[in-house]
């Protein structure tokens, strides 16, 4: 319990700890959706982000995927970063294909390997409809990249990916639009046993998916897998499903209360407990639409939460996290999120927790 109290104290102290990672405002650009993070060697981190139009999308100029992906790398666990590099597949697609590319998740199963899990967007003023997702691999720490390989024949969006016992597991909502509105709009788990070269269907999540979107996964201390879904009709309660066999079967489903609401949830297990962060809802104006961070002891029940970035972000706060185990037995947690600066335009911020 002392370790959890330390975690809560650290979380409470993050509100003034944001550092600017990408200043899109300087160029009138924006950067939604793509926040893939991976540690591909001890202390070596890759962080993706999008470089997109600051004007497209009449509803919220800057809230779109019309552009390409870039990434930076760090050799000191996210303290300092090298110069940005363009992700080749996204640039080639932007120039020559009828779709753009986003990347919300990346993983690594061995040293210097990076597997970027990409979604493909047909709408030049937004994202949807989505095409089938693809994986793009690097075996030299992001110096060069291979060809894109289709992950499955289902159109949709990859919401999370984790590595367990050397295998990759990803969470896909099979829906070419945003919210699930049809019976066939289901969440699936896919598995790769060959470092992201191919994927096979592992299982299907249970329950009603009507009005659901987004998702996250975490492996708890007891080895159980928890998958989460966002319910747009109930932003105070985060849907969860628990499996003891990595998504083949499910033993429990329910909802976890989030006092400040949650949208696009991102969950991680850290020393002392669990963290959950995302936009603090936006379907109504009852509460602020800030960037919220919760802590908990079991990945199901959450504390009262705290805002770690305060600005009305109706289209902001897409986020991700990376937990790094350090040689001295401590952990460093990197959180990356889009932060608003004008209408639908966003910069990219970083937060670091030393646990």
Feature map (PLM): residue ranges:
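Asp-box/BNR beta-propeller blade signature and adjacent active/binding-site loops
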Residues: 2-355
